[in-house]
């Protein structure tokens, strides 16, 4: 974990809970969905069920705590029971923007936070794959060193950050009503 006490605000991205001793406010919550370019889907066809991903070009985020050759997926009908799909990624990257760019270029199917990809879906540059399945829930928290002595400028910025993020996320998702 980053040295939270060294900064006024530390942004922590997580797909799980974190240390309960951390003083933090949730800034953002999103679901990760699978997307591909229309060109890729014309060329390879769209998967009809999660197991079909084994036959597709998958673009996968590589993180220390993740198994890169497997996607966990949840269906809204059974949100507590994920399924695990073995995949053979054609691209492993440690940066979401690289995977998004590769998907836009027709390289394959990737998992991206819904609010991040909503503008591309709205413009038709990407298409959601295997809806309503999701590949995870992501949260971002703003951690502060202490609640007692938070400077007013920090409190004002934190309130602004949370409200602006909420508005931008709502705007992105509203623009993409079919997400």
Labelled PLM ranges:
Residues 1-93:
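Acidic, Gly/Pro-rich loop/turn segments at junctions of secondary structure
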Residues 22-23, 128-131:
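Short beta-strand/turn micro-motifs at beta-sheet edges
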Residues 25, 51, 100-101, 155:
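Alpha-helical segments flanking ligand/cofactor-binding loops in enzyme cores
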Residues 35-36, 94, 112, 161:
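A conserved hydrophobic position in a structured secondary element of the catalytic/binding core
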Residues 81-128, 135:
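Hydrophobic hinge/microswitch elements
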Residues 114-119, 123, 133-179:
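C-terminal effector-binding regulatory domain of bacterial HTH transcription factors
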């Amino acid at each position: 974990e980053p040295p939270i006490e060294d900064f006024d605000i530390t942004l922590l991205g997580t797909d799980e809970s974190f240390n309960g001793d951390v003083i933090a406010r949730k800034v953002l919550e999103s679901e990760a969905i699978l997307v591909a370019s229309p060109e890729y889907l014309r060329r390879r066809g769209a998967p009809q069920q999660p197991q079909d991903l084994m036959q597709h070009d998958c673009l996968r985020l590589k993180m220390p705590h993740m198994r890169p050759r497997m996607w966990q997926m949840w269906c809204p009908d059974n949100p507590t029971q994920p399924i695990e799909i073995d995949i053979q990624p054609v691209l492993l990257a440690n940066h979401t923007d690289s995977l998004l760019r590769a998907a836009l270029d027709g390289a394959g199917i990737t998992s991206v936070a819904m609010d991040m990809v909503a503008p591309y879906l709205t413009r038709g540059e990407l298409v959601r794959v295997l809806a309503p399945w999701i590949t995870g829930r992501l949260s971002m928290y703003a951690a502060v060193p202490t609640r007692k002595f938070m400077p007013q400028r920090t409190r004002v910025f934190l309130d602004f950050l949370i409200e602006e993020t909420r508005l931008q996320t709502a705007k992105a998702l509203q623009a993409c009503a079919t997400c």
